[in-house]
């Protein structure tokens, strides 16, 4: 009987050992998966690994898929026919944009009388009538007596103030309200831009290569003698023969500024610095005066020159890319809608667009937080408590 019990106990012990081994193997597998995840997370935080991965992905961009390569020759011929059709589509699209440019020229002439009147009001050469000044404002429902009282108080305040002419510092305010432009402004630019009277856009004549010119009109001032500063952008609306599929509308090919005739000691694009130099042998010290470039909005009128071969260094290319963006923004947004940038209403519209994107981003963050709650292997970043991660 004892032998039977011992035998049964031995069988049970062996079974228990097998169960234990299975559990240990399972736990070992889980540990391996956890370590693999941790290793992957560490690798993805390594800038060198990310750079190598990005370089590999960049190499794959434009690489034909295996499916395309495996197509029969007769099918590849038909794909080539589709590509030729795509090139013809790009050529038609180029003509479309040329006609759009002609329409812009036509309607610019219709807008100009309104822009001229805007300039007259800003610069106090025309005083708008009562009818022209009426503007429907959304107001809360208040009694007529309160409205009349508020109107009288406002008129009394206006009488106490000195009567300004036109709309002072109109364009300077516009520039300061727009991040793209305010980033270019320096403190020493502001006194000059207070003299800016108007900005106009002129399109190239019919039959001429596509271009547009920005004209900045200044009242007489103590900084330079120019009445008008100009910046011309040359455009092209035709597919590149070497890469026709990259065509996506007109592109700016280059720009030319103008020479600013600065008055003596008023050139804000240059600054004078003094450096002390010590003679190695005699030990004497001398002061050297040197003129160097200075940050200023007015560098906008002296863009880098594009060499004939079209090759630019990285700094010049970055400057021109930003320059083209600014020129396009002035033409498309600032000049047609300047009053709305002056009041900030156009900026609020732009912010609303970004808010929508922000809400989407918030939703994505919420999803990530949910994943963190459900993921037992989630580990917070170094220097951050798990509680802090969930509270953010």
Swiss-Prot record:
Q: Which Gene3D superfamilies match?
A: 1.20.5.1500, Nucleosome assembly protein
PTM entry text: Phosphorylated by cyclin B-cdc2 kinase complexes.
Q: Where is this region: Disordered?
A: 1-37, 346-392
Start-end of Acidic residues biased regions: 13-30, 346-377
Report whether Transcription shows up as a keyword of the record.
yes
Q: Which GO terms describe its biological process?
A: nucleosome assembly; positive regulation of transcription by RNA polymerase II; primitive hemopoiesis; spermatogenesis
Q: Give residue numbers for sequence motif NAP1L motif.
A: 126-150
Query: GO molecular function of the protein, one example?
Result: cyclin binding
In which tissues is this gene expressed?
A: Initially expressed throughout the embryo with expression higher at the animal pole. Becomes localized to presumptive ectoderm by gastrula stages. By stage 18 (neurula), expressed in the neural plate and posterior to the cement gland. In late neurula/early tailbud stages, expressed in the neural crest, neural tube, eyes, tailbud and ventral blood islands. Adult expression is predominantly in ovaries.
InterPro entries according to UniProt = NAP-like_sf (IPR037231), NAP_family (IPR002164)
User: Mind listing the UniProt keywords for this protein, alphabetically?
Assistant: Cytoplasm, Developmental protein, Differentiation, Nucleus, Phosphoprotein, Spermatogenesis, Transcription, Transcription regulation
Primary subcellular site in the record, as a coarse category:
cytoplasm
Subunit details: Forms homomultimers. Interacts with histone B4. Interacts with the B-type cyclins ccnb1 and ccnb2.
Described function: Acts as a chaperone for the linker histone to facilitate deposition of histone B4 onto linker DNA. Required for both remodeling of sperm chromatin into nucleosomes, and linker histone binding to nucleosome core dimers. Plays a role in tissue-specific gene regulation. Required for primitive hemopoiesis, acting upstream of tal1/scl.
Q: What is this protein called?
A: Nucleosome assembly protein 1-like 1-A
The scientific name of the source species is: Xenopus laevis (African clawed frog)
Organism classification, top ranks?
A: Eukaryota, Metazoa, Chordata, Craniata, Vertebrata
Gene name per UniProt? nap1l1-a
